Swiss-Prot record:
Residues 30-117 are periplasmic. One of its GO terms (cellular component) is plasma membrane. GO terms for molecular function: protein kinase binding. It is a single-pass membrane protein. Modulates the activity of the EnvZ/OmpR two-component regulatory system, probably by directly modulating EnvZ enzymatic activity and increasing stability of phosphorylated OmpR. This is Modulator protein MzrA. Its main location: membrane. Belongs to the MzrA family.
């Protein structure tokens, strides 16, 4: 009887080890992060000043646009939105509030621009 148990345990472990990568692969492929949209704001003319993040926050917040973060980056400002559906409205608001800036909406995975103004 001891011999039977010894043979069953390794086969159960082998089966578990064979199925584990498949389970991990399936769980990773089924998880998909929602698309994140960010607005990339750059000055219309090189060297022109951009407003600070608080000004941008005020303009978007007063219109009900939810913001994840506002980050300065290489003479530009990156605004990450909480809701991708609000990107069009946010782009329009910022294009009006910042007439001397270019506002580009991009997906976070680095694909081509969604809209530009």
């Amino acid at each position: 009887m001891m011999t039977n148990r010894r043979f069953r345990k390794p086969s159960a472990w082998r089966l578990l080890l064979l199925l584990l990568p498949l389970v991990v692969l399936l769980s990773m492929s089924s998880r998909r992060l929602p698309d994140e949209v960010m607005l990339h704001i750059t000055p219309l003319h090189q060297g022109a000043p951009l407003p600070d993040g608080f000004y941008i926050y005020q303009r978007l917040n007063e219109r009900g646009i939810a913001i994840k973060s506002i980050t300065p980056e290489n003479d530009s400002i990156i605004v990450r939105l909480s809701s991708p559906e609000q990107s069009g409205a946010a782009r329009e608001i910022l294009s009006t509030a910042l007439p001397y800036a270019i506002v580009i909406a991009q997906r976070s995975n680095g694909t081509s621009p969604v809209t530009r103004s």
